Amino acid sequence: MKICLIPARGGSRRIKNKNIKNFFGKEIIYYSINKAFRSKLFDKVIVSTDSKKIANIAKSYGAEIFIRAKNLCDNFATDLDVIKNFVNHYKKKIHMDYLCYLYPLNPLLTISTLRKCKMLLDKGKCHKIIVVSKYNSSIERAFVFKNKYIEFWKKQFEQKRSQDLKDFYRDTGTCYWYNLNKIPKFNKKMNFKTKAVVLNTFEYFDVNTLKDWNVLKKIYKYKLYLKK
C-alpha cells in the first residue's frame, strides 16, 4: 500500500494555528492534502495530529486521521520519531510499500515534483528520497567570524574561480519518501541510502514567522499570475 503521511501538530509557538491558518480561502493544510489526492500516487492520505480541530478539517478534505502518541506532541519530537510511531502502529494492520512524509505548509510544491520523487524511488537502489534546492553560490567561499574579524571558512578556496567551485544543496523540508520494503526497522542510527530531486524555482519557502507567511502569500500570488 502507498501512503502519504502529513504531520500536523496542534501547537505552534511562532505562528498560532499555523497548519490550519487561512491561505487564500482555504486552511493551508488543504493544499498538501489536495495535491496528494490529485497526484493519484497514494492509496491513503493520512494526517498525523494531536488536535481535534485539525483532525476535523483534514477529514473534511478527505484525509484519514492518525492520532499520534502524546510524547510526540512537543517541539522535541523529530520527524523520524513521528514516522516510526506511525509505521510501528500500522505495519501489523496493512502492508506498506512506500511512504511519503509530506509537510502541511506546501502550497508551492507541484504534483510534478511528487511524481518525480515516486519515479526515482521506483528505480530502486535507495531507501529514501529527499527534495533539495541548490545554493545560489558555493559555500566553499563562505565567511566566518573569528575573534571579531571575518575570514574565509576555507582559505584554499579564496582564489578559486566561481566556475571551479562545487555545487552545494540544501534540504527544502517539503517531503521525504521511504521505500518501506527496503527498511526493516526505523531507528535513528540507520544509514539511509538517499537520492534527491532538485526543486525548481518558487517551489518552497521556509515559514517560521508572520513575515515569512506574508512573503509566501506573495510568491503564491505571483505563481498564480504566471499561470494566466
Would you name each region that the model predicts?
Residues 41-46, 127, 202-203:
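Short active-site oxyanion
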Residues 185, 197-198, 202-228:
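Hydrophobic helical membrane-anchoring modules
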Residues 1-48:
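N-terminal glycine-rich phosphate-binding loop and ensuing alpha1 helix
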Residues 42, 94-96, 123-126:
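Short, high-confidence coil segments that cap the C-terminus of an alpha-helix
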Residues 41, 61-62, 146:
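Short, structured coil segments at secondary-structure junctions
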Residues 46, 52-100, 108-112, 116:
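Short phosphate-binding loop-to-helix
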Residues 107-199:
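Conserved core of the sugar-phosphate nucleotidyltransferase
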